[in-house]
Amino acid sequence: MSLIRLGLALLLLLATVSQLLQPVQGRRKMCGEALIQALDVICVNGFTRRVRRSSASKDARVRDLIRKLQQPDEDIEQETETGRLKQKHTDADTEKGVPPAVGSGRKLRRHRRRIAHECCKEGCTYDDILDYCA
């Protein structure tokens, strides 16, 4: 009887130690609405520039953002090529004194795609999401 109690105590100790050694919160895969909600909760100052609008337009913005987050890689590559062409045009404009606004916007859009890829495909941690906050 004492041997059974000793075995159960060791089993309980082993289970407790194994739970303590696991990371508290590892990488979690979040896509679409779940990713947007995580960004809203974690990013106090927002993850994009926000303008208060009516709830109908907010729903439209959420749907648009979800569509962009779920956009296939081929579309992303095509937009990147288009962005490069715009960037060349912007470089010529810079010589004339026009600020390079097109390239800046392109960089911001690609940044949002990276968090979608990172969190949806590979999983991300709290610290990863915090890096994308404004």
Curated annotation (Swiss-Prot):
The keyword Secreted applies. Residues 72-107 are annotated as: Disordered. Residues 54-108 form a propeptide. Expressed at a high level in the embryonic mesoderm, with expression continuing after gastrulation and reducing from stage 12 onwards. Highly expressed in the embryonic anterior midgut rudiment and larval midgut. Residues 81-96 have a biased composition (Basic and acidic residues). Residues 1-26 form the signal peptide. It is found in: Secreted. Its main location: secreted. The keyword Cell wall biogenesis/degradation does not apply. GO terms for biological process: adenylate cyclase-inhibiting G protein-coupled receptor signaling pathway; insulin receptor signaling pathway; larval feeding behavior. Disulfide bonds join 31-120, 43-133, 119-124. One of its GO terms (cellular component) is extracellular space. GO terms for molecular function: hormone activity; insulin receptor binding. Gene3D superfamilies: Insulin-like. Coiled coil: none annotated. Keywords: Cleavage on pair of basic residues, Disulfide bond, Secreted, Signal. Belongs to the insulin family. Heterodimer of a B chain and an A chain linked by two disulfide bonds. Possible ligand of InR/insulin-like receptor. This is Insulin-like peptide 4. It comes from Drosophila melanogaster.
